[in-house]
């Protein structure tokens, strides 16, 4: 009999976590399949970042189990670029698992072209705009043998127009280099545009109170009926006006 979770990258079973006497996650079950983009939304402080930290292995659950298949990389709100390294050198950090120097250089050039930063490979992070820095960060986590991306509000520090561009950029990159993604955001638009599945978390201690499967293929425009319908459903679940 075939395992019902065959092809799954992440499996959480009855996961609970607390900080001292404060319960943050309660008996949470979740399966994330290979190649799926799962976006989590919920009230501020409900435990979304804690869940990412559990998935990354940075912290361990108080109870329950987490099974992970593949190499995990994390993207945070603030990029993790090394200021003393150039664009090319920062991307090369993600390629250290490739032992062949020729293959490593070929991959580095391909990634620079993929994020449309040709001619910027010798620039330092302080010489780039916020959006350009996040594109370098995306290239770095897509480099080499990464399988799972954990993304904690990666575009929230950017202005609205740049956020829109970065959503399109991420969708384009995932088309060309598919990965399993777990993405945390407070942005309802972002969730509806990027996700295959949206998880709405409850107030703390968080449980999954609603799952929304978005049928239209990525990438999606903001005017896509599936995006608009998903936004309405998310807002309704969060108790916000539509």
Name every feature range the model reports, one short phrase each:
Residues 138:
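Hydrophobic anchor residue at the start of the ABC signature
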Residues 143-147:
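A short, proline-enriched helix->beta-strand linker immediately N-terminal to the Walker B motif
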Residues 102-120, 172:
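Conserved ABC ATPase "signature" region
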Residues 56:
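Helix-to-loop junction immediately C-terminal to a conserved catalytic motif
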Residues 124-128, 132:
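Conserved ABC ATPase signature
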